[in-house]
Swiss-Prot record:
Keywords: Acetylation, Metal-binding, Phosphoprotein, Prenyltransferase, Repeat, Transferase, Zinc. This is Geranylgeranyl transferase type-2 subunit beta. It comes from Rattus norvegicus. GO terms for biological process: endoplasmic reticulum to Golgi vesicle-mediated transport; protein geranylgeranylation. Binds 1 zinc ion per subunit. Catalyzes the transfer of a geranylgeranyl moiety from geranylgeranyl diphosphate to both cysteines of Rab proteins with the C-terminal sequence -XXCC, -XCXC and -CCXX, such as RAB1A, RAB3A, RAB5A and RAB7A.
Length: 331
């Protein structure tokens, strides 16, 4: 007998319409409660939190409700002498938060707020001889950081600052027999890493190196009877994988391989009808992270009330058109 499949049951009274205004109100009020326990405890990833909130507000056409000046001052104060950006004031710089900062500034058309040359030098300094990237000076290697590096430089128009060929070589060395990618060579395939690697290969024009049918099959197997998607076998579904899996499928031209209606129902069931926002699963606590990826997933599914989203950068397509960054996808 095989292992029993892990899944959730969606109740008959679960939300089935998009509560857009409630989500906008939830995000708009989130940053104003600066003495909340939840807000204080998320300081270590604040820069990414700001990116999640601003991006989802822009996708909903509500960016004007956020305090642009306060955010720009915050980002400027998080850039370090080395060029990298930290999650919050007084924290160490990291590639993850450097990308988030560049995404926010691109959203606001305010890249001048930081020293771009120093950002480029910082990204450059984190590339290793084998082409991989460390996330920071402490040296953890992960394909997520390869994506962060090329995404940051692509938005700045400085992709030629690194050894792109070696970077491609490293990412391809992380490809597995099932078509997926792990965090390092030999690591298990995981939907989050697959998103990073397919996004990386889209930015570097190397998607022809991917076996789209094999990878598409692995990604489609992430869909469970509830309609939700998990990140790897034997895991529960989670709204954030509505983004990582769906965006990867869009990048490799296989979005039509999953049951879109069942996924849409699962995402909508994860809304909180009282507070607004999305949770990882129906009935759980909402947060800005799952709210962005729920809304972005619905955008990829063609939700007309939401702006079209870039499957590579998780930013509004109109923003990327403005800065002329258009990675090629598999048609």
């Amino acid at each position: 007998m095989g292992t029993q499949q892990k899944d959730v049951t969606i109740k008959s009274d679960a939300p089935d319409t998009l509560l857009l205004e409630k989500h906008a109100d939830y995000i708009a009020s989130y940053g104003s409660k600066k003495d909340d326990y939840e807000y204080c405890m998320s300081e270590y990833l604040r820069m990414s939190g700001v990116y999640w909130g601003l991006t989802v507000m822009d996708l909903m056409g509500q960016l004007h409700r956020m305090n642009k000046e306060e955010i720009l001052v915050f980002i400027k104060s998080c850039q370090h002498e080395c060029g990298g950006v930290s999650a919050s004031i007084g924290h160490d710089p990291h590639l993850l938060y450097t990308l988030s900062a560049v995404q926010i500034l691109t959203l606001y058309d305010s890249i001048h707020v930081i020293n771009v040359d120093k950002v480029v030098a910082y990204v450059q300094s984190l590339q290793k001889e084998d082409g991989s990237f460390a996330g920071d000076i402490w040296g953890e290697i992960d394909t997520r950081f390869s994506f962060c590096a090329v995404a940051t430089l692509a938005l700045l128009g400085k992709l030629d600052a690194i050894n792109v060929e070696k970077a491609i070589e490293f990412v391809l060395s992380c490809m597995n027999f099932d078509g997926g990618f792990g965090c390092r060579p030999g690591s298990e395939s995981h939907a989050g890493q697959i998103y990073c690697c397919t996004g990386f290969l889209a930015i570097t024009s190397q998607l022809h190196q991917v076996n789209s049918d094999l990878l598409g099959w692995w990604l489609c197997e992430r869909q469970l009877p509830s309609g939700g998607l998990n990140g790897r076998p034997e895991k529960l579904p989670d709204v954030c994988y509505s983004w990582w899996v769906l965006a990867s499928l869009k990048i490799i031209g296989r979005l039509h391989w999953i049951d879109r209606e069942k996924l849409r129902s699962f995402i909508l069931a994860c809304q909180d009808e009282e507070t607004g926002g999305f949770a990882d699963r129906p009935g759980d606590m909402v947060d800005p992270f799952h709210t962005l990826f729920g809304i972005a997933g619905l955008s990829l599914l063609g939700e007309e009330q939401i702006k079209p989203v870039s499957p590579v950068f998780c930013m509004p397509e109109e923003v990327l058109q403005r800065v002329n960054v258009q990675p090629e996808l598999v048609s």
